[in-house]
Amino acid sequence: MMEGRTNTRVFRNQSELDIVKLLVDEWRKRNGVLRSTFDLEINASLGSRSPQREFIMQHNESDAAFIRRLLQRRGIAWFFQSGLPRRGEQRRPEAIGHTLVLFDDPNQLARNAAGSVRFHRDAATEQRDSITGWSAVRMAQPGQASLHTWDYKQPRGREFMTTSTRSRGNQGKQGNELAAALDDYHVAAPHLGDTARDLVELGDVQMAHYEYAAKSFHGEGGVRDLAVGEWFRLTGHSEIDSHPDNEREFVVTSQHIVARNNLPVEIGTRVERLFSHNGWSADDYGVFANSDHSGEPIRYKTRFTCVRRGIRIVPPRPTVPRPALQTAIVVGPANDEVWCDELGRVKIRFPATRPEDHTHAGGAGSSDTDADSAWVRVASSWAGSALGTHGQCGARLLPPVGTEVLVEFAGGDPDRPIIIAQMFNGAAPPPAFRHEAGLPDTKYQSGIRSREVQGQRGNQLRLDDTPGQISAQLASDHAGTELNLGYLTEPRQGGSAAPRGEGAELRSEEAIALHAARGILLSAWKLLGGGRKGGQLARDDYLELLRECGELCAALGNHAAEHNGMPVDTREQDELLARFKKWEGGSNTMPDAAEPGEPVIGITSPAGIGFASTKAIVSYSARDIDTVAQQHLQLTAGQRFSLNAGKGISLFAHNGGLTGIAHAGKLLLQSQHDDTDINSAKNLKLTATEGTATIAAKVILLVAEDGSFLKLGDGPPVMGSKQPLKFHAPDFLYDEPESMTAQFPTFGQAGADQKLVVRYAPGIPLENGERPAGGVVKDAKLKIALSDGSAMQARSGIDGKSDLIERGAMHMAEIGLMRGGDQ
């Protein structure tokens, strides 16, 4: 009956015996005939030894084939026994029906009603049935059975993945030598055993089967009480009688019976004719003689096989159904769009499973929840071999809940599903990329598109291979952030898109930052060089421009210094050029060179660089800023132009003159604490077109080249000359004494007093473990050396500021920090 029902269903967290019990109970409950004529009896020796399995699947198997597979895997033997068990009491052989008996210990089997059976001729005159034929049968079997099963949870524990069992049976001297060369090495499905001990037991099962099959006995006779699954004692056989008592007891393992009814001849003939018409041929039983030696017809004859009692009876290794590829749906708890464990495994439901087959487990197996399967591995196109998560490499593309997946079965075992692919379907078609049309309009596009959990946004890698318009895009819907490469277009609709540029584009509706510990080179120079791409930091043109910059700066600066201008300092510029030259030190292009200590940023272009902003542009250097132009340096301000220096300003024009004009407003030139010299190689002209030219000083002295002079102030006015004085005027007017008050500007005495602020570098932890960005350093001792040769000590307060350093002019300072006596 069980052969007639084929099913596909899932069992969770049950042992093989639990499942067999469940199936038999289902048959008995659903079928009134079987309920009264069929039952299951499990030998007490089995107990609860079988571990629970997370996942066992019946796949397109009959219930009978499925039960056989489960029992064979655990090495559990079975037979059918006439009669039904009486719950809590002995079996009722008189009851109409059969019992499926499961056992693994032959010593627990019942003794046959025949008890001791003689080896003797079987004649009608004999008072007891006897065995008339007896022979021992030996079959060469492997001397070792090995079992290997991959354990992906402990991949480095190879020694626990293989178990080997040597035969304890005796196959004779030559038989043992032959068996020693035979090793049944079987590679099973992964993770076959629940534990290492369980794997050893499964390996022992196969060896026990070979020991069982190595030696058996064939017999025949007329013993009507013989039955499979029961043992008897054989007597009267000379060879058997020579063995110890325990080796004269045998368990019947199979039986073939021919029985004839004692009907009258004319009725018997009609019965034979009826059997013939129904295809029931007696030829199958021709191996049995129709009469004994006296010529009398034999009414009953049996041919049987048996093994010595005590030999473990074990069925052969199961043949798994090896299902083809199957479709499944990824499942998970409610409100979880992605559900996995630390190994990236997911839960699945096979759509073919029926709810009515899983009511015993509360629907687990067909509930569309994470109870429908054990964790199932997901195959990846790339999986690394590193220990631990953070050092690992590989591709991680977990199927979300609801995804259709393609399932293969490791080792062909339905109990070992593996997801090998994810599938689109009518309800879940292939994704369209951001703002782009779907298939088939964008059939030239390929890539990856993710989806925000509990949202509609996503991230994507899009490769567009449209003829003549290839491009790549790495993008996130958050802030519209995109990196576009190649032939840039608007989103494709209907297979076409408007062009919007070529090259590369990084864009975002939020911030963009570039961080590089060695430096950044922004260059618009075209790289040349045949099939070579050119160096990453190719900068020959840039270095040439920097060299020209330094030469011009030094040449004009030195010339200015020779003509009373302030000298220029090009050391910082020269050091920067040197760092740019050594930029690649320690890299793969210059592995033997020393690595530069400080990162730099270079910006260069052959046709110009433009900076523009609707608000402020701030440029600052803790050292020098050198701005050099080979031709014109033009600074323009729509309103004020302020130029401030802490230690001198020098303006030098080698040619073309120096022009300073205040078109509207006052022109103010002051030397507040020192002299003012205005020199001209030719003429000096001071004019006041509409006002008064006023020269005010404590003493005014006008001196001509020939020695003539006019001195005003510090006493009476004095004129002097080696030449006669000459006056041109119509008259001389003399009046009372009179003077004017000179108006002098007031110059303040403010110095360059400063307080130093000491801060931690970003990332340096404080005493409490915090890592603030630029947190102040409290109570630090400072040794300060100034460029005027003076030195002092100071201490930072709770705000990180030092004591006030008072100086009349600005100076460069070298600072040493000490804390706790350490510098």
Question: In which residue ranges do the predicted regions lie?
Answer:
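Amphipathic alpha-helical and helix-coil boundary elements used as assembly
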Residues: 1-823
